[in-house]
Amino acid sequence: GIYGPNNAGKTCLIKCIRAIKRVLLNEKSGLMKNIFTDSDICELGVTFMQSGRKFSFDFKYDVRKEEYIYESFSEIFKDQYNNEREVCWLKKDCVNEIYQCMDEDVQVMIPIVSKNNLLCYLIDTSKFQYVHEMKQILIGFADKIDIINMNDIPMKHTIELMKNKNQLQHKVVEFIKNADLYMDNFEYVDMDKIQRDVGEDNDKPEEKVLDIPENIMDQIRLVSTYKGIHVPSMLFDSTGTKKIAAIASYVIEALEQGRILVVDELDSSIHFKLTRAIVAMFNNELNTGAQMIFTVHDINLMDCRRMFRKEQIWFVHKDEEGVYVYSLADFTAQQ
């Protein structure tokens, strides 16, 4: 969990995660220069687990030249005493002209290859063992990340999941029903089952994110049932219930498939007990592969006994020099 006041930098941290994901998937990243130091160099990095192994990847991007001037990929090992050591698979430092790669043929190529993208997207990696495996690891990691904002969640993901009658869909429905004590059912139905004329122009949801003309019919077919009466969810349900319906598919999919769910402003329009319940689904012994990273304002969530370990609670602080992220584990009892 990431805590901090408004405008402290929590959302910027989420944007950094999104930028890293886009870079690793060879998508437009939107990287910007450092506004605090007025430097053209944007530096980002991530340490992550993939298939039970620990890796780190760092890169530097020159915004003005539009070049990746630094790349480093390492695997991190632990010995029996819990000491860590890094084994470098790839290092490309164009500024200091340091080039290393476990594939010797690639090491020779690095200085002469273009810098307008990551190295693994500039060469045919299938011909090189380690660089090819590195690319698969990075893509596999980035593909598992889902990033959503509670104030702007697309309902499309839940709609697509609700169309298929399977175990995943059943769990999504149960999740939504448990979140709303008065709801009997939640389903995706044929239009003839909806007992209301939805032709009035004024009957539109308040949330802009849910008022999407091209998907309007799909959204109307999402139906909530109260005391046996079917009503369109988008017109009758509360903002909180609609947000729960939108996030439900992401939560269940993450838990079932071991994905990484990143949520900005998790506590927006959702009751504290429900926020706590969502976090508890990820933070228990039954969850072996999924992870949720979230930002919140309500510090009461930190007060939940046995909910978090100290290293799972992070704070964001901003001053005139920059934004700092630090863990509760950095503090001792005396501090």
Positions of PLM-derived features:
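Conserved P-loop NTP-binding catalytic core
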Residues: 1-65
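Short acidic, glycine-rich loop/turn motifs
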Residues: 46-52, 74-79, 224-228, 318
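Electropositive, glycine-dotted interaction segments
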Residues: 58-197
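Conserved ABC ATPase signature
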Residues: 2, 201-252, 260, 266-270
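Short, mixed charged/polar active-site loops
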Residues: 54-56, 84-87, 230-232, 323
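Short alpha-helix of the ABC ATPase nucleotide-binding domain corresponding to the H-loop/switch region
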Residues: 271-276
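C-terminal lobe/lid and adjacent interdomain/linker elements of RecA-like ASCE P-loop ATPase modules
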Residues: 257, 277-335
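Post-Walker A helix-loop "phosphate-sensing" segment adjacent to the P-loop in P-loop NTPases
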Residues: 19-30, 255-256, 283-289
